[in-house]
Amino acid sequence: MTALAAAGILTASAREKVFFFVAHPDDTIACAGTMFLMKDKYELHVGVLTHGERGCGEAGYRDGSTKAKRTLEEEAAEAMVGAKVHWFDEIDGDCYANRDVCRKLAALLQELKPRAVFGMWPLDYHLDHATSCMCLQKAVGIAGMRDRIEFYIMEESYDSRTFVPAHYVDITDVVERKRAFIRQHVCQNANDAMCAQEIADGEMRALRCASWMTNGNRGNVERFAVYDGKPQGSRCIFNELPPPKGWSQDWSTAKPSKYTPEGGMK
């Protein structure tokens, strides 16, 4: 075993892959802290459905300036966690889980063979977010990976309505790095408002952990749900991350909730 392997830092070729699929540049702020915790152990990939072309109004969409800005901002942010970005070039606000994009995504999944995939909440208030999850759901099926991949859902602070978390990740030790990640998205972070809101939401998630409040801890947390189809076997990627400090549950055997398109969370 090499010194790097002994330290838990593997070469890119030896790492398992983790794939995140989102609708817009900046959507991975929902899981950026977790990505920082994963970056030295896993090979990270991010698929982005659109370039967020309409994120600064129609004028910026028509002249292409918003697309150019947000593409550069996303590439810079994902470079901080060592993730490779894969663009799907659909149009912000006008994207669908159509055959071509789902097949393109399935082909990428077959190429990468990720251990785990992360998508957006399928009941999200923002239709592009929900669409991106539908694309990922269909692509996992097309790729023949439905019963042999870990499939998780990230919580988007602003729009993940009725979100029911199964896993909590303590990002307190990397929260300043997450701030820097969010601030790469300059055109969406006017007056640092997006950064302030996301960090405050993470602090509130920590306070909602009853065991944290009992033990008087303060920190920052990201939350994730489990999508139906994930095998509930001996492997769970969250078991390889540190649980929230003071967590009182049996972290490895706590039964997660699961989302099903027919019945919601159960």
Walk through the language-model features, giving the residues of each.
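Short, conserved beta-strand edge motifs with alternating hydrophobic and charged residues
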Residues: G47, F118-M120, F151-E155
